[in-house]
């Protein structure tokens, strides 16, 4: 028995829905990029940039410190790779970092901060992943309690949270 127009359209709609779901399912299998480094870099893993997944950041040597911050009432423990290790992985060659947050807030910091201080690209706070609503998933944190110089607006303003990219100039 031949298909009616109605049955034919229903079949086409079902096939279209199934075909549309295939790329979405494949995209779920690909690890999510949480940080992009671009600009003056010598290493890339995507056209013109170096993309990090959370697993890639976790595979770098991890460092922790506990410090007071202006954003929390109690000292917090921050854990993640050193900023200098992230920059080295991307072959950073510039002198200035423009850290860009998910809401497009931008903070500028010298690349040298990563060598002068053990700045952490925190992915954990108090040993737990940081949700976006609490400054995650990534947060540039200086060890404020380790040096009086770091307890100033200059360094607090360089501490971008909800970090999504580093643009190197």
Question: What do the PLM-derived regions correspond to, one by one?
Answer:
Residues 5-9:
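N-terminal export leaders
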Residues 12-16:
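Sec-dependent signal peptide hydrophobic core
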Residues 10-11, 24:
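Intrinsically disordered, low-complexity segments enriched in polar/charged small residues
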Residues 2-3, 26-169:
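N-terminal intrinsically disordered, low-complexity segments enriched in P/E/S/T
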Residues 17-24:
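C-terminal segment of classical bacterial N-terminal signal peptides
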């Amino acid at each position: 028995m031949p298909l009616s127009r109605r049955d034919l359209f229903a079949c086409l709609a079902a096939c279209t829905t199934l075909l549309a779901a295939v790329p979405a399912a494949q995209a779920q299998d690909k690890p999510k990029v949480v940080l992009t480094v671009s600009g003056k870099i010598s290493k890339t893993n995507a056209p013109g940039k170096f993309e990090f997944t959370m697993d890639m950041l976790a595979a770098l040597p991890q460092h922790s410190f506990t410090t007071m911050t202006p954003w929390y009432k109690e000292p917090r423990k921050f854990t993640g790779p050193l900023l200098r290790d992230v920059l080295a992985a991307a072959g950073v060659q510039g002198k200035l970092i423009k850290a860009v947050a998910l809401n497009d807030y931008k903070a500028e910091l010298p690349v040298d901060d990563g060598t002068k201080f053990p700045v952490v690209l925190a992915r954990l706070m108090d040993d737990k992943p940081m949700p976006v609503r609490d400054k995650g998933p990534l947060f540039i944190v200086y060890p404020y309690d380790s040096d009086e110089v770091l307890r100033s607006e200059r360094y607090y303003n360089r501490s971008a949270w909800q970090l999504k990219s580093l643009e190197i100039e």
